[in-house]
């Protein structure tokens, strides 16, 4: 399931890259979105 079905593949990739940076060890914050599903 995609949270942003209206985004282009390029935008999805950019968000994915950002998300991985956010959850990387020692970087950013750990966020768990349980509002879907």
Swiss-Prot record:
GO terms for molecular function: fructose-bisphosphate aldolase activity. Pathway: Carbohydrate degradation; glycolysis; D-glyceraldehyde 3-phosphate and glycerone phosphate from D-glucose: step 4/4. It catalyses: beta-D-fructose 1,6-bisphosphate = D-glyceraldehyde 3-phosphate + dihydroxyacetone phosphate. It is an enzyme of class 4 (lyase). GO terms for biological process: glycolytic process. Its EC number is 4.1.2.13. Gene3D superfamilies: Aldolase class I. Keywords: Allergen, Glycolysis, Lyase. InterPro entries: Aldolase_TIM, FBA_I. Plays a key role in glycolysis and gluconeogenesis. Belongs to the class I fructose-bisphosphate aldolase family. Tetramer. In vertebrates, three forms of this ubiquitous glycolytic enzyme are found, aldolase A in muscle, aldolase B in liver and aldolase C in brain. This is Fructose-bisphosphate aldolase A. It comes from Thunnus albacares (Yellowfin tuna).
